[in-house]
Amino acid sequence: MTDLSDIRREYTKGGLRRSELPEDPMALFERWMEQAKAAELTDPTAMCVATVDELGQPYQRIVLLKRFDEQGFVFFTNLGSRKATQLKHNAHISLLFPWHPLERQVAVTGIAEPLSTAEVLKYFVTRPKDSQIAAWVSAQSSKLSARQVLEAKFMEMKQKFSAGEVPLPSFWGGYLVRPASIEFWQGGEHRLHDRFIYEKTAAGWDIERLAP
């Protein structure tokens, strides 16, 4: 076994206090996202998306957040992918934004709802053409005999759609994650980290401090 126990550091970038928190977690998320972008973090919109299969086995993967508002968080994917198949059977989902250089994490739990075709199309047409073509090429999560198969399919579809617009594939869509809870974590000195969790209620949001 490889021992990694001596890899550690102190967290020194500041704390988080209840008096600083807005009543709406999405306002704090927006503030933190803007700070992550301003700090020029690599892929500040990257989030770890966790879903569960029918046997209760969790799966995780990195996906890019494409939009957020007071309703929740939006991402897009192939509807034949493992994550989409699992969400069809169990819509419970969790998201994690790991902003390590800022010593911050945001963890979300909630329910994933499929987006309408109109909402998906509105985003799809903004993608670069090669990305639109790639959506047609990859049967996400299926097994491939070789990378050359994928590349050949891409060139075939690129030729097919060379003259005009790329249509939205019927098997490509997106989800709105409606949050049930959002936890904000800020690293603290001596491992006394600051954690606050917002939990959705009928009246709005409850806010509680959690032990680190």
Swiss-Prot record:
Entry note: cofactor: Binds 1 FMN per subunit.
Amino-acid positions noted as binding substrate in the UniProt annotation, renumbered to this chain: 8-11, 66, 123, 127, 131, 191-193
Catalysed reactions, as listed in the record: pyridoxamine 5'-phosphate + O2 + H2O = pyridoxal 5'-phosphate + H2O2 + NH4(+); pyridoxine 5'-phosphate + O2 = pyridoxal 5'-phosphate + H2O2
Binding site for FMN: 61-66, 76-77, 82-83, 105, 140-141, 185, 195
Metabolic or biological pathway, per its Swiss-Prot or TrEMBL entry: Cofactor metabolism; pyridoxal 5'-phosphate salvage; pyridoxal 5'-phosphate from pyridoxamine 5'-phosphate: step 1/1; Cofactor metabolism; pyridoxal 5'-phosphate salvage; pyridoxal 5'-phosphate from pyridoxine 5'-phosphate: step 1/1
Gene Ontology molecular function, alphabetical: FMN binding; pyridoxamine phosphate oxidase activity
EC number(s) reported in the record: 1.4.3.5
Needed co-factor(s): FMN
PROSITE patterns in the record: PYRIDOX_OXIDASE (PS01064)
InterPro entries: Pyridox_Oxase, Pyridox_Oxase_CS, Pyridox_Oxase_N, Pyridoxamine_oxidase_dimer_C, Split_barrel_FMN-bd
Keyword Flavoprotein assigned: yes
Record function comment: Catalyzes the oxidation of either pyridoxine 5'-phosphate (PNP) or pyridoxamine 5'-phosphate (PMP) into pyridoxal 5'-phosphate (PLP).
Protein family per UniProt: Belongs to the pyridoxamine 5'-phosphate oxidase family.
Descriptive protein name: Pyridoxine/pyridoxamine 5'-phosphate oxidase
Protein's organism: Shewanella amazonensis (strain ATCC BAA-1098 / SB2B)
